[in-house]
Amino acid sequence: MTVFTLLPLAVACGGDIGLPAATIANTVDTLVLSALNGTPIGPPSAIDLVTGTGSRPELGDDFDFAFDIDSTGTALLYPASRLGRGGSAALQVSSVPFDSIARAPVENFVVDTIMPLTAGKVLMLRSRFSSLLCSVFVGSLPRYAKAEVLELDGVGRTVTLKLMANLNCGYRDLMPGLPDQ
């Protein structure tokens, strides 16, 4: 077995898999995304969880999830894989309030589901695998985040998200401050 095969087991059990020390504190941010369609080119339409920023898929930027509004007016969050991009970005709906989520789970993430968004919905997000800020011994790992839909603007075709992305390689803690795990 390779390290990558054993890695999910080690993470699931809370084992120390030799992650580099966390260097980036978790903070809550507000992110406004414009719909992929029917909005001016320029504002971000997608989320890059590896960097914790909005991104612009039309420019070829890396991203994990993109926002759009369909012809019926339904706001949707698309994993990159559903828009012709590779990757393993995944999500799940959380019944736990945003501020009460302390740690991302390791299971029950869905890779290819287009998620309808409504105000107040809380999501757990997992990024694509990336080696950015990971040690050479660990390889590529996902980043984890939690998000809450604060506002949907059908006229302006935007969504406002409350977002906390843990930018440290493989860490799942989702509380403010420097993460332990």
Question: Which residues does each predicted region cover?
Answer:
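Sec-dependent bacterial lipoprotein signal peptides
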Residues: 1-12
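Surface-exposed, beta-sheet-biased, low-hydrophobicity segments with strongly acidic/polar composition
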Residues: 13-181
